[in-house]
C-alpha cells in the first residue's frame, strides 16, 4: 500500500483531490458485470458517495499500476474525473491460477467492472474499466 499512497501524493501535489480506499475484502466475480468486488469501511463509502454523487459520469478514465507479487496479480487502480480533478485509488488482486473463470469472463465481456460496497452490500458503486487486457497475465 505504500505505492498507493505515493501515487495519491503525486496527484495531490498537482492539485487533485484524492480518495484512497482500503478494502477489507477483495474478490473476483464472474457473473454479470464480471470484475472485482471490494468491501470498504462505511466511512470510506461516505467519502466516495460525496465525490461520485456530484457527477458520476465524469469518473470515466482509469489508470492501472501493477505491483510486483509472487503468485498474485496485484494492481493499484486509479479512477479519475478530469472535470473535477478528483481521483479514487484502490488496490485489487487475484490469483491467475485460481481465478481462471474470472480471466475468461472479463475477456469475453470486453471490460472489467469494480463494485465497491459496504459489508452488508446495502450501498454500492460501480466503475467500468474498458481494457480487460491490462488486468490479465
Indicate where each model-derived feature is located:
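Long alpha-helical, hydrophobic tracts
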Residues: 1-32
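A sequence-composition feature that detects small, non-aromatic residues
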Residues: 8-9, 34, 51, 67-69, ...
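Long, continuous compositionally biased terminal/linker segments
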Residues: 20-82
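Glycine-rich, aromatic-bearing surface loops/beta-hairpins
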Residues: 82-137
Amino acid at each position: 500500500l505504500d505505492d498507493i499512497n505515493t501515487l495519491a501524493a503525486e496527484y495531490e501535489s498537482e492539485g487533485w483531490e484524492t480518495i484512497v480506499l482500503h478494502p477489507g475484502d477483495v474478490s473476483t466475480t464472474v457473473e454479470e458485470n464480471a470484475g472485482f468486488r471490494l468491501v470498504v469501511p462505511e466511512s470510506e463509502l461516505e467519502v466516495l458517495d460525496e465525490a461520485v454523487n456530484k457527477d458520476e459520469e465524469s469518473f470515466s478514465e482509469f489508470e492501472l499500476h501493477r505491483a510486483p507479487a509472487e503468485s498474485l496479480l496485484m494492481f493499484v487502480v486509479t479512477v479519475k474525473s478530469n472535470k473535477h480533478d478528483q481521483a479514487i485509488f484502490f488496490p485489487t488482486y487475484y490469483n491467475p491460477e485460481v481465478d481462471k473463470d474470472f480471466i475468461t469472463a472479463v475477456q469475453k465481456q470486453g471490460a472489467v467492472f469494480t463494485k465497491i460496497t459496504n459489508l452488508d452490500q446495502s450501498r454500492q458503486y460501480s466503475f467500468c474499466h474498458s481494457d480487460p487486457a491490462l488486468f490479465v497475465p
